[in-house]
Curated annotation (Swiss-Prot):
Signal peptide extent: none
The protein's name: U10-ctenitoxin-Pr1a
Alphabetical keyword list: Disulfide bond, Knottin, Secreted
Tissue localization of expression: Expressed by the venom gland.
Length: 34
């Protein structure tokens, strides 16, 4: 399974070969294009 947004990048697989990035450590994480 994959996701488009999450609260943490730990063990998060992003859809469409995107990279998980957080605005702050452990919060507001989103999957963005590389």
């Amino acid at each position: 399974s994959c996701a488009d947004a999450y609260k943490s990048c730990d063990s998060l697989k992003c859809c469409n070969n995107r990279t998980c990035m957080c605005s702050m450590i452990g919060t507001n994480c989103t999957c963005r294009k590389k």
